[in-house]
Amino acid sequence: MTYSVFIAGLVAGATLNLLLLRTILAPPFRIWPAPEPGSWQSLTFWSLFRGGMMLTLVVAALDWDSVHLLDRSRFIGVPLFLVGFGIAICGYFNLGLGNTYCGSDGLVRHGLYRFSRNPQYTASIVGLFGLALAANSGLTISLAAMMAVAYVLMAYAEEGWLSQLYGKPYRDYCRQTARFLDVAGILALLDRKKPSRQAG
């Protein structure tokens, strides 16, 4: 059963990634952002994406600790999984439901979007990395890597669409904000929040 679920996840992830690559390399074909709810693109994308993510979780449970690649240090994966997907959920609240599902509810630059143009994707990749570490399973590592690639391709696939939709404000935002993570900006913010030391 484990291998059947793994093969299904592999097919879903590989198909999704090939369609995303075609979106990037061969416009006007577009699987993501999906043109409209109910379209074949939307149904195909969400079936493959949700299926790939769900099957990755199922394989992690079925194949848990099967290869003993790592020692107890792998349990750092659990907090990475929780924090990663917790931040991704926060990103949905910043972005709004409409924008999350390919709407045009306005360009979002506040909250997590000050530090990343794709905070949900970035955090989800961290969560997948945590899942792969914690599961200690070669099959889970393969599927998690496949879905992490999907998140990267999704970020690239939507940039042309967003540029066309929002024009110069989006292009300015791209120049000011990292695609995945503005490490320097985060460090600067943390530094500003440190209490100043006064000579006494």
Where are these regions (language model features)?
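Membrane-anchoring alpha-helices and their flanking helix-loop junctions
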Residues: 1-109, 127-200
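Histidine-centered phosphotransfer motif of kinases
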Residues: 110, 114-122
